[in-house]
């Protein structure tokens, strides 16, 4: 059987065939005798079991087409599935549907999935390992756990006079960025309590001060732009 499957860019569907017939044809292409049970299992898995069996792929929504494409890719039980931008153009429900299908394939069917995507917030919800690339070169390869543990904390400060506060913090070994309504401190030797003391000594009224973890998206851009 086909042990590697891929969906690159637009899925290759037979638009004049139903979902069932598309899957049946794919099994024939892989040299297998079409099995009704197997086709029904895949239709269930990708959420197309309740679609009108006469409905042709050309009349499917973008999300349905993408789910059928995944069905075609897994009908022959591959060990590795390669997906290129699998959620491009999908609405929030379509994105969640694809994410749920991929999680099932990974957890219940033990399929390794390699996803190339620019939508980092989505990768953050499903990936176990990352290969980060820039200009065609691999710049980092690591597990999600390792990357998460290395993500720095930043401190967010909001005061009555942010322009004055940033000068005081900068003079006290803080790397600061002034945002529209707050200050972001990304590197400092001070604790939050020490920052509060420094600002209060200088009669700065503090509205809020808290720690926030750098997001994976910020981590990625810092890594890529630092090169």
Give names to the regions the model predicted:
Residues 70:
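Hydrophobic anchor residue at the start of the ABC signature
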């Amino acid at each position: 059987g086909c042990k590697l499957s891929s969906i690159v860019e637009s899925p290759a569907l037979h638009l004049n065939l139903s979902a069932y017939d598309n899957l049946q044809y794919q099994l024939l292409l892989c040299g297998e005798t079409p099995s009704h049970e197997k086709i029904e299992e895949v239709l269930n898995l990708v959420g197309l079991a309740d679609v009108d069996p006469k409905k042709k792929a050309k009349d499917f929504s973008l999300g349905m087409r993408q789910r059928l494409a995944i069905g075609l890719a897994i009908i022959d039980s591959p060990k590795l599935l390669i997906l290129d931008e699998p959620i491009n153009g999908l609405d929030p429900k379509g994105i969640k549907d694809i994410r749920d299908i991929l999680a099932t394939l990974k957890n219940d069917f033990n399929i390794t999935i390699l996803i190339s995507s620019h939508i980092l917030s989505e990768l953050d919800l499903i990936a176990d390992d990352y290969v980060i690339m820039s200009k065609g070169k691999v710049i980092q390869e690591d597990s999600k756990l390792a990357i998460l543990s290395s993500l720095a904390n930043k401190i967010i400060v909001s005061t009555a006079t942010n322009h004055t506060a940033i000068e005081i913090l900068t003079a006290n070994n803080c790397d600061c960025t002034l945002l529209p309504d707050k200050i972001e401190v990304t590197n400092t030797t001070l604790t939050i309590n020490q920052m509060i003391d420094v600002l209060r000594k200088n009669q700065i009224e503090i509205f809020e001060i808290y720690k926030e973890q750098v997001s994976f998206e910020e981590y990625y851009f810092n890594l890529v732009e630092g090169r």
